[in-house]
Amino acid sequence: MIVNGFIVMGVSGCGKSTVARLLAERLGWDFLDADDFHSSENISKMEAGIPLSDSDRAPWLALLNEKLISTLAAGRHPVLACSALKESYRTKLFHETNGLQLIYLKGSYDLIWSRISQRKGHYMKPEMLRSQFEALEEPVGALVMDIRLAPKEIVDEIIKTSNFNPSSLSSQKPT
């Protein structure tokens, strides 16, 4: 498959936004953070420590899918940071898209807990991490990256192992 974009997935605190932003910068592609697309109601629930239900997520996933489709249709290349914890969520994200590669940032509960408990100013509370691990359905066919690696190393490996259309990399920055 020729890669036209990426979805970088995993539980909260695994480094999705950091890796996706760095990857987008390296490739000259469009960084999208799924957190920026949550409704105020969803953010309020998460701030209160209430895990989102599938029905809470449905409009958010539809909006993300529309954004992926419109970005690709405009000839751009999206790099989306999104939890995408369940297979059904990933199916909705990938609907009517072509060439998106799924990257799964995998790490232990203890490592991610240590990261998320140090994070300041994020609406996702550390106490909700357990619910994310419980909801997580590990993906099949994703490029799995060990989050013990530094973000730059993860991005280097993604770029090295992905099959790009050379014209999509015309603005790639040197490493």
Feature-to-residue mapping (PLM):
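Walker A (P-loop) ATP-phosphate-binding motif of ABC ATPase nucleotide-binding domains
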Residues: 5
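P-loop (Walker A) phosphate-binding loop of NTP-binding proteins
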Residues: 11
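Conserved lysine of the Walker
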Residues: 16
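Conserved substrate/cofactor phosphate-moiety recognition/catalytic segment
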Residues: 21-66
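Loop/turn-to-beta-strand initiation segments
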Residues: 74-78, 101
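Conserved phosphate-donor/acceptor-positioning beta-strand/loop module used by diverse small-molecule
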Residues: 96-115
